[in-house]
Amino acid sequence: MFNWVKTAMLMAAITALFIVIGGMIGGSRGMTIALLFALGMNFFSYWFSDKMVLRMYNAQEVDEATAPQFYRMVRELATRANLPMPRVYLINEDAPNAFATGRNPEHAAVAATTGILRVLSEREMRGVMAHELAHVKHRDILISTITATMAGAISALANFAMFFGGRDENGRPANPIAGIAVALLAPIAGALIQMAISRAREFEADRGGAQISGDPQALATALDKIHRYAAGIPFQAAEAHPATAQMMIMNPLHGGGLQNLFSTHPATEERIARLMEMARTGRFD
């Protein structure tokens, strides 16, 4: 429940930030335009983001004939989660990772790299796919799509404010120093809010995945393995499309310093500790 409240508050914050920037650029009219612009971008993302992401990763759809063990595993977990059967995809990549996409449970897809299938045991793989189906059940793909779109739009509006200035309610030019400050600080604030939402949803998907599979320890050991293997294997498609990093079960981007501050995922150690506590107590709340 705490993660859901936190997510709602953060989404309200990123929406408010977007509208405030619109107001700084063009007063009440600017706020209205900013809101309409955000709605248009979210509409496009809602309907087409899954196709775009699967194409970016050159994901190939599989069925029971082409990937019988993997497909049956997803079907069994979807049944346990009371979800429609999602489309199932494989990505020919050595880096171990997986993600879910789709605008709702009826139009969902799950994808895994060939690398993760080689690295993990069947039990661990069940834990991973249960995590992805938890994202589907919680409609996290919609949440992440909206926040990513809003964060990108905030950055675009902030740049517009810096280069073209803005107007107050009376039509007078806005303070240029304020425009520069907005251009520098607003994208950072938007990105931080986006990352906080993503981290909250990852914790919730870990918990939900543990409930679906009934085996939190399997997901814990899977996360440990993915973390260790992924550190030495570049995920080229993810590096080329860093905005999609938040979709993955493990952050696929390499680097440290500021990149850790803007990480889309919680610390792996903390995720594992929470899952092991679930395994010890048998409680998923």
UniProtKB/Swiss-Prot annotation:
The active site is at E132. It is found in: Cell inner membrane. It is an enzyme of class 3 (hydrolase). CDD domains: M48B_HtpX_like. Binds 1 zinc ion per subunit. Zn(2+) binds at H131, H135, E202. Its cofactor is Zn(2+). This is Protease HtpX homolog. It comes from Burkholderia vietnamiensis (strain G4 / LMG 22486) (Burkholderia cepacia (strain R1808)). The lineage of its organism: Bacteria, Pseudomonadati, Pseudomonadota, Betaproteobacteria, Burkholderiales. The gene is htpX.
